[in-house]
Curated annotation (Swiss-Prot):
Function according to Swiss-Prot or TrEMBL: Acts as a chaperone.
Protein name, UniProt field: Chaperone protein DnaK
Pfam families linked: HSP70 (PF00012)
Family, per entry: Belongs to the heat shock protein 70 family.
Organism expressing this protein natively: Maridesulfovibrio salexigens (strain ATCC 14822 / DSM 2638 / NCIMB 8403 / VKM B-1763)
GO molecular function: ATP binding; ATP-dependent protein folding chaperone; unfolded protein binding
Acidic residues bias locations: 621-630
PROSITE patterns documented for this protein: HSP70_1 (PS00297), HSP70_2 (PS00329), HSP70_3 (PS01036)
InterPro entries in alphabetical order: ATPase_NBD (IPR043129), Chaperone_DnaK (IPR012725), Heat_shock_70_CS (IPR018181), HSP70_C_sf (IPR029048), HSP70_peptide-bd_sf (IPR029047), Hsp_70_fam (IPR013126)
Gene name for this UniProt entry: dnaK
Annotated stretches, region: Disordered: 596-638
Keyword Chaperone: yes
Upregulating conditions: By stress conditions e.g. heat shock.
């Protein structure tokens, strides 16, 4: 049975862990890194993922996609997406059903498809690390992700060739890693501020039970917003000094993004840093350089409002859990942004205690996901995980009212039923409008889906009894059914990402991903064939230079001809043609080696006469040697 890997599919970076025996281990990537940048670069010939994609972003900004997680399950018309599009060098367009997709060279990609490219790379790294095929995974999502965003994540896994055994909330995964093997009962708060999202979860951990009491958050608050605040400041400073607006220059913005992120990280340990970008742009007077000093105090002023936005979700989560800040035993910091001193200071002020820094904020979520994978595989026993649904679920009733069936922070899996009736006489059908959210009016909440229960018998309004049942599985994914109690007629719907990918879309993307994986294998085979050819040409030419005059002229001519043949096809795109020419040269080289070996042996035999005579003389000399007796004398003085 193959291992179930744990994947933290992050906005900025992704990480993979796997259980080895009873211990979770980090899967390093091809570059030896413990995390992989969640970036995909599209070039004319290939798709690049991770660090290699990040390195080419400055010269290829419009075809390098980062922070795709921010678009998962979102409509292109939403205020969050419109705001994000203002900062994005890559184009965001209307996709299927109005979803936010990206467009690269005229082709549209869904966020699930781009995420699948990242997941494929993580899967490949895990297979290299384990030495076996990987087909199953536990993938984490922000706790405050709605149903559409969870479905989009699950679709991404499927497109990448992974069976997603469980979708688990990031703070829950972190607490699972923190509470693993802990016996003492503790009430903990997991403060998770990552690259794109913020979550706060209140949990009870101890005696191998991890129970989520409440969760809250903001799915559009994270490190990317902090970076954008720094970028905006740099743009304004440059405009003030030079009168040039860099915000329309995509290549300059990409350089500013890299420099802004670097400055932000440096100011977590230093009090001041300098952003120095030579040749950022040019005008009629020549090139322009950007040199701006930023102090930690300045950075904190720029992002203070962003840090303040974490406060209200914390208050709501505590209230829903029925606790106060004083009741919390430990505050666990998760996500790269929690390294920022201002964030740590605000957390300490809110909870009234020093935050716990015992876990690695970049890896703890993936670690927890791998433990969940171990639980599902049966490798980790006696650990019970009780998670919750982050948002209330219900249906629209008469007057456009949102009628709540499942309250937020209800432990999942769960099932709830409620009986409704018709609003008009002789109503032949009812429309079930499924919603998720906290607002009293249906129009203000998020639509998850709609379906019809038809064939109702003619009856006065208020007589038919229609039972609506909500069923949420352990992944937080919703199924809804409606049943006419009189006739027994039933209609159900599994909620898929609203306006999201159909089964046909996913199948097409799976095939596309598989074909790209096949292309990658072919490309690797081509590179290996070219490298092998290059190496053989070098060694054969070197051998000919060193011993060419001692080689049979016909053989030398044959080898030189085969070297030329291989050079002609070395840069072709057909690995089989290169291999055939390589094999032909290899056979000729073997003949060269055989001839040289034969010459060396012949030389050795010719030298044996005189050498043998010398040895015989030495043996004769031994006849004159007289053996003498001797006595061993031991020195007894110490």
């Amino acid at each position: 049975m193959s291992k179930i890997i744990g994947i933290d599919l992050g906005t900025t970076n992704s990480c993979v862990y796997v259980m080895e025996g009873k211990d979770p281990k980090c899967v390093t990537n091809a570059e030896g890194g413990r995390t992989t940048p969640s970036i995909v670069g599209f070039t004319d010939k290939e798709r690049l993922v991770g660090e290699i994609a990040k390195r080419q972003a400055v010269t290829n900004p419009e075809k390098t996609v980062f922070a795709i997680k921010r678009l998962m399950g979102r409509q292109a018309s939403s205020p969050e997406v419109k705001k994000w599009a203002d900062h994005c060098p890559y184009p965001i367009v209307d996709g299927k059903g109005g979803d936010a997709w990206v467009e690269i060279e005229g082709k549209k990609y869904s966020p699930s498809e781009v995420s699948a490219i990242i997941l494929q790379q993580l899967k490949k790294d895990a297979e290299t690390y384990l030495g076996e095929t990987v087909s199953e995974a536990v993938i984490t999502v922000p706790a405050y992700f709605n149903d559409s965003q969870r479905q989009a994540t699950k679709d991404a896994g499927r497109i990448a060739g992974l069976e997603v055994k469980r979708i688990i909330n990031e703070p829950t995964a972190a607490s699972l890693a923190y509470g693993f093997d802990k016996k003492a009962n503790e009430k903990i708060a997991v403060f998770d501020l990552g690259g794109g999202t913020f979550d706060i979860s209140i949990l009870e951990v101890g005696d191998n039970v991890v129970e989520v009491r409440a969760t809250n958050g903001d799915t559009f608050l994270g490190g990317e917003d902090f970076d954008n605040a720094v970028i905006q400041y740099l743009v304004e400073e440059f405009k003030r000094e030079n009168g040039i607006d860099l915000s329309a220059d995509r290549m300059a913005l990409q350089r500013l993004k890299e420099a802004g992120e670097k400055a932000k990280k440096e100011l977590s340990t230093a009090m001041e840093t300098e952003v120095n970008l030579p040749f950022i742009t040019a005008d009629q007077n020549g090139p322009k350089h950007l040199m701006v000093k930023i102090s930690r105090a300045k950075l904190e002023k720029l992002v203070e409002d962003l840090v303040e936005r974490t406060k209200v979700p914390c208050q709501k989560a505590l209230k829903d859990a029925g606790l106060t800040a004083a009741d919390i035993d430990e505050v666990i910091l998760v996500g790269g942004m929690t390294r920022m001193p201002l964030v740590q200071q605000k957390v300490q002020e809110f909870f009234g205690k020093e935050p716990n820094r015992s876990v690695n904020p970049d890896e703890v979520v993936a670690m927890g996901a791998s433990i969940q994978g171990g639980i599902l595989a049966g490798d980790v026993k006696d650990v019970l995980l009780l998670d919750v649904t982050p948002l209330s679920l219900g249906i629209e009733t008469m007057g456009g009212v949102f009628t709540n069936l499942i309250e937020r922070n209800t432990t999942i899996p769960t099932r709830k039923s409620q009986v409704f009736t018709t609003a008009a006489d002789n109503q032949p059908s009812v429309s079930i409008h499924v919603l998720q959210g906290e607002r009293p009016m249906a129009a203000d909440n998020m639509t998850l889906g709609r379906f019809e229960l038809t064939g109702l018998p003619a009856a006065p309004r208020g007589v038919p009894q229609i039972e609506v049942t909500f069923d949420i599985d352990a992944n937080g994914i919703v199924n809804v059914s409606a049943k006419d109690m009189g006739t027994g007629k039933e209609q159900s719907i599994q909620i898929t990402a609203s306006s999201g990918l159909s089964e046909e879309d996913i199948e097409k993307m799976v095939k596309d991903a598989e074909s790209h994986a096949e292309d990658d294998k072919k490309k690797q085979a081509l590179i290996e064939a070219r490298n092998q050819a290059d190496s053989l040409i070098y060694t054969t030419e070197k051998s000919l230079r060193e011993v060419g005059e001692n080689v049979d002229a016909a053989l030398k001519s044959d080898i030189e001809a085969k070297i030329e043949d291989l050079k002609k096809v070395q840069d072709s795109d057909d690995p089989e043609t290169i291999k055939q020419a390589t094999d032909a040269l290899a056979q000729a080289s073997h003949k060269l080696a055989e001839q040289l070996y034969a010459q060396q042996n012949a030389g050795a035999e010719g030298a044996e006469g005189p050498e043998g005579a010398a040895n015989a003389g030495a043996a004769g000399a031994d006849d004159d040697v007289v053996d003498a007796d001797f006595t061993e004398v031991k020195d007894e003085k110490k």
